[in-house]
Swiss-Prot record:
Domain HTH tetR-type: residue ranges: 10-70
Official protein name in the record: Nucleoid occlusion factor SlmA
Function in brief: Required for nucleoid occlusion (NO) phenomenon, which prevents Z-ring formation and cell division over the nucleoid. Acts as a DNA-associated cell division inhibitor that binds simultaneously chromosomal DNA and FtsZ, and disrupts the assembly of FtsZ polymers. SlmA-DNA-binding sequences (SBS) are dispersed on non-Ter regions of the chromosome, preventing FtsZ polymerization at these regions.
Gene Ontology molecular function: DNA-binding transcription factor activity; transcription cis-regulatory region binding
PROSITE patterns per the UniProt record, alphabetical: HTH_TETR_1, HTH_TETR_2
Keyword Hydrolase: no
A GO biological process held by the record: negative regulation of division septum assembly
Source taxon at top rank: Bacteria
PANTHER family: HTH-TYPE TRANSCRIPTIONAL REGULATOR RUTR, NUCLEOID OCCLUSION FACTOR SLMA
InterPro entries from the UniProt entry: DNA-bd_HTH_TetR-type_CS, Homeodomain-like_sf, HTH-type_TetR-like_transc_reg, HTH_TetR, NO_SlmA, SlmA-like_C, Tet_transcr_reg_TetR-rel_C_sf
DNA-binding region: 33-52
Length: 198
């Protein structure tokens, strides 16, 4: 029984990895059909549906992975780092680095892979970005409590500016077919962001 569960879990992971790889390839800029995905995995469409009731559930699983990866690591940054600017820098670097290491998933983050899918999937990505923006806003607001002095600019505006930078770099990465890596020149770009944190 345990072997059967492990085999099923492995096949599910194989399907998700194949979907992520297809999103990374030129196929990712077009609608991915279950027929193409089944051929990529080397199984029938019926076999895909034994593991996932729909393609939407496959995307849901990839979005869950993205959410878990990013939110867990953001929480670790907040636990380990106390300096506000360092926290913000690490969160930005996390978002950009995650996108760079996972090009196929970046197509999901930017919404490109979801254009032909159910609207609720884009809604989940929107919620993820709202959660990240709320975390950034909280980090910015805690500066006053931690360091005795806040920012001259409203924290909501600063948080949206930081997140817009990240989203822009991820979109540029996808638009360039993964040529312009989000972390390229980060050490030169970060001071431009940090200069806004006054």
């Amino acid at each position: 029984m345990a072997e059967k569960q492990t085999a099923k879990r492995n096949r599910r992971e194989e399907i998700l990895q194949s979907l992520a790889l297809m999103l990374e390839s030129s196929d990712g800029s077009q609608r991915i059909t279950t027929a193409k995905l089944a051929a990529s995995v080397g199984v029938s469409e019926a076999a895909l549906y034994r593991h996932f009731p729909s393609k939407t559930r496959m995307f849901d699983s990839l979005i869950e992975f993205i959410e878990d990866s990013l939110i867990t690591r953001i929480n670790l940054i907040l636990k380990d780092e106390k300096d506000t600017t360092a926290r913000l820098r690490l969160i930005v670097l996390l978002l950009l680095g995650f996108g760079e290491r996972n090009p196929g998933l970046t197509r999901i983050l930017t919404g490109h892979a979801l254009m032909f899918e159910q609207d609720r999937l884009q809604g989940r990505i929107n919620q993820l970005f709202e959660r990240i923006e709320a975390q950034l806003r909280q980090v910015l607001r805690e500066k006053r409590m931690r360091e005795g002095e806040g920012y001259a600019t409203d924290e909501t505006l600063l948080a949206s500016q930081i997140l817009a930078f990240c989203e822009g770099m991820l979109s540029r990465f996808v638009r360039s077919e993964f040529k312009y890596r989000p972390t390229d020149d980060f050490d030169a770009r970060w001071p431009l962001i940090a200069a806004q944190l006054q």
